[in-house]
Curated annotation (Swiss-Prot):
Induction per the UniProt record: Highly up-regulated during programmed cell death (PCD) induced in acd11 mutant.
Protein name: ACD11 homolog protein
Family indicated by similarity: Belongs to the GLTP family.
InterPro entries named in the record: GLTP_sf, Glycolipid_transfer_prot_dom
Alphabetically ordered keywords of this record: Lipid transport, Transport
Domain of life of the organism encoding this protein: Eukaryota
Amino acid sequence: MEAEVEEEEEDMFEDAVCTTQARVNTPLSVITEAFEDLADLVKPQRSDEIDEDELRLDDFCSACTHVSVLFNCLGFAFKFAEMEYIAKVKDLVEASKTFETLHNILDLDVEKETVKTPGSHSRNLRRVRQGLDLIRAIFEQFLIADDYSLKDAATTAYTEVCAPFHTWAVRTAVYAGMYTLPTRDQLLLRLNETDQSVEKNMRRYMEASRPIIEYIDKLYIERNIKLDW
């Protein structure tokens, strides 16, 4: 009888631990873990297990679908970026039902001469890559600023990553919307993070996303496609 009671108590403890762990899975930590898993697939030390040109499109899309939450947390200022990002990811998700890898979609568009054509998978991949880089740049600027000003961080990041490729009307709307960005405390609340955890998870995302961004850039460069678009 005592043994059964002890076993039940152990089961309850294990359930409690699992529940507690589930509760600490914040949106940012989920994104970070997804990109860390993805980054492991393109790091040189994994070259004996997977060809560096064969990152699966469905795996890539699975990680990318989580990122829209971050754009949503930034509010109105990045509504355009959020809508564009979601639309492009959805297109790639559909493409993953036909194409196995990222380089498959690029090869087809190169053959058809539609790499830069609006709506092509290769163009949409390029825009998704910019979205990932924008989040990375925002985090980077946010952490190096003395006052942790999200407005300053987002303005600098947008100017660096996306502004060169957006029309005047879009740039004007984005810059005007910067004044509606949440405060630092509001952002932490939306992300369900603390001062300590947000810095840790932001740095983890920056580290994990970098090789993915470089990997995508390399796919274009190897096919003699410039990155100035």
